[in-house]
Amino acid sequence: MLENYKNHVEERLKQGIPPLPLNAEQVSDLVELLKSPPSGEEDYLLDLITNRTPAGVDPAAYVKAAFLTALAKDETSSPLIDKQHATKLLGTMLGGYNVESLISLLEDDEVGSLAADGLSKTLLMFNAKHDVIELAKNNDNAKRVVESWSDGEWFTSKPKLPEVIKAIVFRVDGEINTDDLSPAPDAPSRPDIPLHALAMLKKTMQDPIKTIEKLKESGLPVVFVGDVVGTGSSRKSATNSLLWHIGEDIPFIPNKKQAGICIGGKIAPIFFNTLEDSGALAFECDVSNMNLGDVIEIYPYEQKVIKSDSQEELCSFEYKSNTLLDGVRAGGRIPLIIGRSLTDETREILKLESSKVFTR
């Protein structure tokens, strides 16, 4: 498995993209390797289980969660992962297969506190939140989780946007539709975000990917600027491709990105929504004086953009919704909605007034 995987890594490297996330079969093999690691491969194996295995309810996540749970409960062992580290890793898996395990570990004297840390930041709890609330009646770790949810710590622990964001412009003229960002002939590769993203704008401009890479050499975040952005059919893949190039890595989640900045003279409503879902800062304003390679300063609270060298104001703007900045901070509109409702429901059960940490 390891040899095949390393060959796959080499092949993908030639295309300038990361390897595919591990599948369930590969994770099963990885588990055996972690139990008795070959000499010299220790760090590599740890990176695979930590950063290259999907989270949530992916079949590979099931295998990962089962192994980490067995480690945390002393049902198996690995020289590389003790029960404390196993519990911490369970806490990075977003929700799904890790939830039941973390709840049961709240009652463990050795790792209960670490399980509480993980659950405090886990939003995809669904009905399992009631189990934690019930357990909190006589378990201090569970009580801490419930208090954390009610205080909205999953949100307040994330950094706010800075007062000013200095960025470099990747400008595409004219109308950029979703087929430009995610071409139909390349549809088979859409589930493989990094591979599909190589096709972005290939019909529209020469060497778009090389252009973006060159802009990144400035060390500044790249902001996507277009006259009319995201028209055409609804395609989440269009957002995925754009954010692959201008977004930020999601910790512990392979081959997917969030955040990023998109400015359009006009942004199509459905495309705007998918950007918002992914935690991007997206807004409409006059882009006529923003050119490829310009360094700009975006003031997200004062709602203006200025040119960095001349300090000339290029445009002012308004957000389409008053909760947009909360969504950016939360890592997307979807985590914001789910997390806010977890906080609200917990406060309701505790008979507390509505939380003030969110913009309503």
Where are each of the predicted segments found?
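Short coil turns that connect the paired helices of HEAT/ARM alpha-solenoid repeats
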Residues: S36-G40, K73-I81, S104-G112, A136-D140
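Structural detector for internal amphipathic alpha-helices that build alpha-solenoid repeat scaffolds
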Residues: Q15-L20, E42-P59, L80-G95, S101-S104, ...
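Conserved, function-defining core regions and hallmark residues within catalytic/recognition domains
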Residues: V146-G219
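Amphipathic alpha-helical packing elements
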Residues: L2-V31, S36, L324-V328, R333-I337
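Amphipathic alpha-helical scaffolding segments comprising HEAT/armadillo-like alpha-solenoid repeats
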Residues: A24-E32, A55-D74, L94-L106, M125-A136
